[in-house]
């Protein structure tokens, strides 16, 4: 089942995706809710980011192919060392944008690239859970684009600019609840040309392991998001580009790129 968050005429709600229609949900998606008879064509509404998370986590260097690409292009010694450890970090929730929104390239940045990823959507509070318990705490999955600037900002002591600048967190278009995350393709396209494709089967730390490890020290709340890593190579984005992140079982997240 696919759940979308949308806005029409200033009113926001959740809905279940039924073909090219949205069937409105009344109540709390993460609690008690029911389906109504109200429907809207998808093309008549604004699709919003699928949740409003309290935290937006990310796992870096989670695929061997991506590690190899980064070693080739960045600080090889540091990348090789970091890739051996589980190193989650937080992407600022203020950078989140949704389907069709614009990625803005900061005037000060000199190299901004995409990172198409699978995103975990937490469904209920999770604290000190095991990998085996993790599926029951996950509502579903969506597409994400971990927009990053690795140019002159690469050596920043934190990710505050290179990972969490405004608009650097596209996510959507909706949540798929019926998905086995262990072997799905992640496809990234720029201006219609495929630039990266990989499978979640190549993850070093799988989705259930990731949720479990983070929950040992941090309570995850309903609607929280976790980026699970880019599977392969990345390329620079330019003003006017259209970047798509597609996971066939979920849908396609599409955003246009513009200069500040």
Where in the sequence are the language-model features?
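Residue-level recognition of short, solvent-exposed, well-ordered loop/turn junctions
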Residues: 52, 58, 98, 113-115, ...
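A short secondary-structure junction signal
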Residues: 68-70, 99-102, 107-108, 129-134, ...
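Hydrophobic alpha-helical segments and helix pairs
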Residues: 77-128
């Amino acid at each position: 089942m696919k759940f979308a968050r949308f806005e029409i005429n200033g009113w926001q709600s959740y809905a279940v995706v039924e073909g090219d229609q949205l069937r409105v949900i009344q109540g709390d998606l993460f609690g008690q809710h029911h389906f109504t008879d109200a429907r809207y064509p998808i093309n008549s509404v604004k699709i919003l980011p699928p949740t409003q998370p309290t935290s937006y986590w990310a796992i870096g260097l989670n695929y061997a192919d991506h590690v190899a690409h980064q070693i080739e292009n960045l600080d090889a010694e540091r990348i090789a060392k970091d890739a051996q450890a589980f190193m989650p970090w937080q992407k600022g929730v203020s950078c989140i944008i949704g389907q069709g929104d614009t990625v803005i390239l900061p005037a000060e940045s000199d190299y901004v690239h995409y990172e198409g990823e699978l995103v975990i959507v937490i469904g209920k509070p999770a604290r000190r859970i095991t990998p085996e318990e993790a599926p029951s705490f996950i509502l579903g999955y969506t597409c994400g684009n971990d927009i990053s600037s690795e140019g002159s900002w690469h050596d920043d002591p934190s990710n505050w600019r290179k990972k969490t600048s405004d608009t650097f967190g596209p996510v959507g278009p909706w949540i798929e609840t019926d998905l086995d995350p262990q072997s799905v393709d992640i496809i990234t396209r720029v201006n219609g040309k495929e630039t990266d494709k990989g499978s979640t089967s190549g993850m070093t730390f799988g989705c259930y392991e990731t949720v479990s490890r983070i929950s040992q020290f941090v309570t995850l709340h309903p609607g929280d998001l976790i980026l699970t890593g880019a599977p392969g190579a990345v390329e620079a984005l330019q003003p006017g580009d259209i970047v798509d992140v597609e996971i066939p079982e979920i849908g396609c997240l599409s955003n246009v790129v513009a200069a500040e």
